[in-house]
Amino acid sequence: MRIEIWSDVVCPWCYIGKRRLERALGQFEHAADVEVTWRSFQLNPDTPPGTAVPTLDYLARRFGPQATAMTTQVAELARAEGLDFDFGAALTVNTLDAHRLLHLAADAGVGGAAKERLLRAHFTEGADLSDQDTLTRLLTEAGADEPRVRAVLASDEYADAVRADFDEARMLGANGVPFFVIDRTYGVSGAQSAETFLHALRTAYAAEDAAEDAGAR
């Protein structure tokens, strides 16, 4: 069973949804058969590269007085999942380079570790995920090869793969993230509850089993 997840590393709901999916997988009887693949999606593709805007300022400009209540609510929901969000330190940036490096990490077999490291760095450490030295450090901590990381950052390698993920998200009807697709058949949009994810996993697995049984007859 394959779960593809479209998300951005500066998306709070994506981190919350990741934790809820992980809780569901902890209860799923066939979790050992599940492969998770991370896909790219940018919330702020028009942010100029190299520009880091305090997230609270960015949200205040976009949502006005509601921004404070929004971040307070999201931080509370994150705490329920064991996450300590620090919106006061977070920076809104262009995440294209981060996504290119996540493709590199996936090819190196450390995609999951890299995704978690970048999310944690953004939401709890106030890291600038557009800064190449910061990205190099974080990817290396996740297990990627430092010279390879620097080589990718010095080129446009994996940019086509990132754009292909964007195009595929649109084709699948995803206009927001997180967006989860199970076996290219079942879609789950948003940071749903662990119970919702578990139901989707069991439904998809049962359907796959039934299809295999029918094909064996």
Task: Cite the ranges covered by each PLM segment.
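Short, well-ordered beta-strand elements
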Residues: M1-W6, E35-R39
